[in-house]
Regions:
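Conserved nucleotide-state-sensing and coupling region of NTP-binding domains
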Residues: 238
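Glycine-rich phosphate-binding P-loop
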Residues: 203-234
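A noncatalytic interaction/capping subdomain that flanks phosphate/NTP-handling catalytic cores
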Residues: 1-209
């Protein structure tokens, strides 16, 4: 178990494990295998007595039974317990009133670097509890997926009641970020009356804020990068 390793050590491990290499500029470059994007067709949310009435079920938010999730969770925890893992404690949301402590367990130093870069780094000693847990078993496959009624041998499942996200069979790091953002999409509006937004944002000299909404690849980041305004962020806000 490698807990909260510093980034330089993670970079060294990634290169030593032949998982990544340094570019001419010194940046770390790594490949995520056959998955270069998220897999929405294999994403599920556990449907229980609490989520049944609060989730807009359909093609995007596909339900999974508690029993099937528990079966997959048992496989993930057993698999991770038999392999080297990288564990990191971070925070989602900057505002102290809404901050969520997140614990991630991954198989790759590259994934751990991603978590370190994507979420808020805080003093681990100050985190008294874990609000959300992400278990990413990227190299595990669901060989009997057809028998279980799943479309593929990989999947991402959110248990919004027990605050657990499991990722199976995909090393695309965006699944980690989007898993937590999806959890916040459910939790913050329901529990704190906070609207979560997939948008970029900037602010002008008169403290006027502009929001740019759009699907991935539509130009949110480009439009928010205005030399006359300060960038707040380019992807997710509340």
């Amino acid at each position: 178990i490698y807990f909260q390793l510093p980034v330089p050590e993670l970079v060294e491990r990634a290169i030593k494990n032949n998982e990544a290499s340094l570019t001419e500029t010194g940046a770390l470059s790594f490949k995520t295998g056959i998955f270069t994007g998220r897999s929405p067709e294999s994403r599920f949310i556990v449907k229980d007595s609490e989520t049944a009435e609060h989730v807009n079920w359909g093609k995007v938010n596909k339900p999974m039974s508690i029993e099937l999730f528990d079966l997959l969770l048992a496989r993930v925890t057993e698999y991770l317990s038999l392999n080297p893992i990288y564990v990191r404690s971070v925070q989602a949301c900057n505002h102290k009133d809404y901050a969520q402590n997140v614990l991630t367990v991954t198989q790759s130093p590259c994934q751990d670097i991603f978590v370190n870069n994507m979420f808020v780094n805080v003093d681990v000693q100050s985190q008294k509890s874990v609000d959300w847990t992400v278990l990413a078993a990227s190299n595990l496959k669901i060989d009997d997926h057809a028998e279980l009624g799943l479309p593929t041998s990989h999947c991402v499942v959110l248990d919004l009641t027990r605050h657990v996200v499991i990722i199976i069979g995909t090393a695309y790091t965006g699944e980690i970020k989007k898993g937590i953002f999806s959890a916040l999409n459910y939790y913050l509006p329901l529990k704190h009356n906070v609207l979560t937004m997939h948008c970029s944002a900037n602010v002008g000299k008169k403290n006027d804020t502009a929001l740019f909404f759009g699907l991935s690849g539509t130009g949110k980041t480009t439009l928010s990068a205005d030399h006359g305004r300060l960038l707040i962020g380019d992807d997710e806000h509340g």
